[in-house]
């Protein structure tokens, strides 16, 4: 789960992290009122969407030379003008795709006199089971280019959660940022505060870009992104309350109601699989055969008729889907139960696109018999490779 920048900053402030003053706004009038409450005379107007690259983004409805989603205003009047241009319009960034995201809220912050920009993030390193702090002296809008062109400018400090954050970790962060004296102490303190928040809130990712050094010698968190482990949200009702469903794909929201893991992609072949690893392998082999998956959909280990029907409905809501590949390995789930669910779901949704089904595992023959006797044009497959070839052929035949 993701939250907006202003929400992330409110959470971090509870852990003592220094952030510039700022107020969220849903209307032009609220943006103007927010600016009037800030010291000024400089203000920053920020579009609030769940995507990075806002500063370099472009609004679909505005001229090509118009400014992006993060703008410096030198007066209250400019704040008003920027708010009018941004609210309700579609911001396209490197992370949104061509469709972009509509800007429904803004964050108006006090201007900061910046001397230097740094980068700091924390992620769960799944390979080691530890928290990795990633830092760079090259913070700002071009951090992706830095990571690609000059990876030596990025340093990683790994923390064993059993040990926790120790003073030497803080010093390592400061040294990696080439800081000394009071600034090094500030960096160490901020890193510790961020780590405490990261662990306490069950974050999966926390990114500060940029962490800025001001002209008067202070370190401030200027922009932040936070993502949370969805499996731990039951422990954080305060975080769940921050969820903005308008920023999420409606199909993904619907899928979550049935405990389905669904992610929309840009292809034309819908996938329904049990198990994340098998789902990724299925998507890979579809691409290997020349087409592209329309989604990632893991029905999990306890799929029933209701879940399978919901999965079909969610897949078919995507108009780009021209065929569906079902790939099920029956371990805990029995293939005959899944087959019954597939047949019932296909009848209920009046399936009109090609459907290829590959079953393997417990009660596989019973499952295949149910599909064969269903009276539906379901194409059986013997293995994963056969399934991929058949669904690609079926989709191309009706194209």
Curated annotation (Swiss-Prot):
What are the annotated GO cellular component locations? cytosol; succinate-CoA ligase complex
Q: What is one process in the GO biological process aspect for this record?
A: tricarboxylic acid cycle
Entry keywords, A to Z: ATP-binding, Ligase, Magnesium, Metal-binding, Nucleotide-binding, Tricarboxylic acid cycle
| Family designation | Belongs to the succinate/malate CoA ligase beta subunit family.
**Record: residues binding Mg(2+):** 209, 223
Name the enzyme group at the top EC level: ligase
Question: Which GO MF terms are attached to this record?
Answer: ATP binding; magnesium ion binding; succinate-CoA ligase (ADP-forming) activity; succinate-CoA ligase (GDP-forming) activity
Q: Where does substrate bind?
A: 274, 331-333
Pfam families recorded: ATP-grasp_2 (PF08442), Ligase_CoA (PF00549)
- Give the function comment from the record: Succinyl-CoA synthetase functions in the citric acid cycle (TCA), coupling the hydrolysis of succinyl-CoA to the synthesis of either ATP or GTP and thus represents the only step of substrate-level phosphorylation in the TCA. The beta subunit provides nucleotide specificity of the enzyme and binds the substrate succinate, while the binding sites for coenzyme A and phosphate are found in the alpha subunit.
Could you tell me which pathway this protein works in?
Carbohydrate metabolism; tricarboxylic acid cycle; succinate from succinyl-CoA (ligase route): step 1/1
Domain (ATP-grasp) ranges: 9-254
**Note on how the cofactor is bound:** Binds 1 Mg(2+) ion per subunit.
Reaction catalysed by this chain? Answer: succinate + ATP + CoA = succinyl-CoA + ADP + phosphate; GTP + succinate + CoA = succinyl-CoA + GDP + phosphate
Q: Which organism is it from?
A: Novosphingobium aromaticivorans (strain ATCC 700278 / DSM 12444 / CCUG 56034 / CIP 105152 / NBRC 16084 / F199)
Names of required cofactors: Mg(2+)
The protein's gene is named sucC
Quaternary assembly? Heterotetramer of two alpha and two beta subunits.
Q: Which residues bind ATP?
A: 46, 53-55, 112, 117
What this protein is called in its record is Succinate--CoA ligase [ADP-forming] subunit beta
Q: Which NCBIfam families match?
A: PRK00696.1, sucCoAbeta
What EC number(s) does the entry state? 6.2.1.5
């Amino acid at each position: 789960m993701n939250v907006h920048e202003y929400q992330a900053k409110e959470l971090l402030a509870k852990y003592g992290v220094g952030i510039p003053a700022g107020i969220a706004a849903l209307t032009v009038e609220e943006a103007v009122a927010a600016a009037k409450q800030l010291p000024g005379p400089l203000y920053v107007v920020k579009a609030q969407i769940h995507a990075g690259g806002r500063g370099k983004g472009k609004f679909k409805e505005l001229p090509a030379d118009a400014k992006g989603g993060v703008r410096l205003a030198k007066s209250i009047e400019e704040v008003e003008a920027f708010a009018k241009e941004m609210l309700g319009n579609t911001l396209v960034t490197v992370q949104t795709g061509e469709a972009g995201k509509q800007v429904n809220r803004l964050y108006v912050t006090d201007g900061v006199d910046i001397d230097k920009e740094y980068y700091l993030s924390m992620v769960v390193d799944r390979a080691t089971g530890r928290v990795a702090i990633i830092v760079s002296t090259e913070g700002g809008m071009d951090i992706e280019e830095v990571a690609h062109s000059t990876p030596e400018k990025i340093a990683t400090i790994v923390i064993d959660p059993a040990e926790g954050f120790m003073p030497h970790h803080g010093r390592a962060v400061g040294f990696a940022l080439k800081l000394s004296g009071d600034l090094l102490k500030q960096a160490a303190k901020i890193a510790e505060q961020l780590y405490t928040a990261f662990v306490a809130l069950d974050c999966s990712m926390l990114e500060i870009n940029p962490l800025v050094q001001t002209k008067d010698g202070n370190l401030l968190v200027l922009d932040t992104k936070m993502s949370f482990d969805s499996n731990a949200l039951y422990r954080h009702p305060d975080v769940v309350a921050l969820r903005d469903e308008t920023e999420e794909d409606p199909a993904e929201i619907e899928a979550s109601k049935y405990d389905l893991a669904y992610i929309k992609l840009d292809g034309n072949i819908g996938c329904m699989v049990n198990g994340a690893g098998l789902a990724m392998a299925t998507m890979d082999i579809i691409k290997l055969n020349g087409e592209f998956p329309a989604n990632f959909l893991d029905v999990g280990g306890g799929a029933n008729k209701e879940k399978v029907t919901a999965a079909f409905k969610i897949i078919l809501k995507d108009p780009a889907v021209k065929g569906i590949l079902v790939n099920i390995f029956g371990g805990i789930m029995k293939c005959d139960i899944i087959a019954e669910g597939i047949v019932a779901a296909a009848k209920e949704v009046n399936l009109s696109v090609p459907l290829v089904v590959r079953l393997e595992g417990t009660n596989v023959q019973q499952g295949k018999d149910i599909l064969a006797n269903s009276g539906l044009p379901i194409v059986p497959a013997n293995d994963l490779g056969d399934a991929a070839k058949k669904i690609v052929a079926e989709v191309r035949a009706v194209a």
